[in-house]
Amino acid sequence: MILSGRRKFFYSFDLVKAAVSKIGPLTGREEKSLESFEISPDSRTIAFVGNEGYILLISAKTKQLIGTLKMNGSVRSLAFADGGNQLLSSGGDGHVYHWALGTRKCIHKAMDDGSLSGISLCTSRDSSLFATGSTSGIVNVYKRDDFLGGKRKPLKTIENLTTDVGEMKFNHDAQILAITSRKERNGMRLVHVPSFSVFQNWPGPRFSLHYPRCLDFSPGSGFLSVGHAGGKVLLYKLHHYQNA
């Protein structure tokens, strides 16, 4: 388990040994915060958002810096694809970058439709879809192969949020896309991806999501957890999915 905050270092927690290790500051780097990161699906690489357009690649095994990637603008969001062999990034220049981690090269860069500054990214488990979120609350959903092939228009533009897009997640079979805004009370929506319609009956009037900060689906999408600014984690059962 990796834990980080607005510090020059992060923590690695070994669940088996119940041991905590402090990692950093990273040699040769001047980042004052390592609060934003993503772990690859194969658990080999940790990618941290760095300063001045840099993405820091850390070995999950050794916890050492193994490389950097450089965007033209600031980095705001990261998402792995292709089982951890590729990385997507977005930020201040409004572009979505695709990186091949084997060569540490940018293999594709294109504008996110209608975005001036990208602040959120997520990919589906099979990497066929990805979603981008912007400061205007707009979420674009793309078919990744089409985007890489030069098609710039998203499959769908979702306009149900009105402030900065925060955490986004596809569930395991990419039937549901959860989107949030941490600046909006109850600022979370569940989108049915095949029809791109928003579930109007969720979470319902009896439940308050406060200001959502983070979320995740269980491996089989039987459960959805949401953490909010009030310091609580809410657990929901999704009855459509039989397996947890």
What are these regions (language model features)?
Residues R7-G24, R29, G50-V75, G83-G84, ...:
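Per-blade loop-tip surfaces of WD-repeat and WD-like beta-propellers in eukaryotic adaptors/scaffolds
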Residues R213-C214, S218-A244:
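Blade-level signature of beta-propeller repeat domains, shared across WD40, Kelch, NHL, RCC1
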Residues I2-S4, I46-V49, L88-G91, F130-S134, ...:
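Conserved beta-strand element within WD40/beta-propeller blades
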Residues K153-E167, S197-P219:
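Conserved blade-ending motifs and adjacent loop-strand segments that build the rim/top face
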Residues F37-S43, L78-N85, S90, L121-S128, ...:
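Loop/turn segments within WD40 beta-propeller blades
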Residues T162-V193:
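Loop/turn-rich, solvent-exposed surfaces of beta-rich toroidal or solenoidal domains
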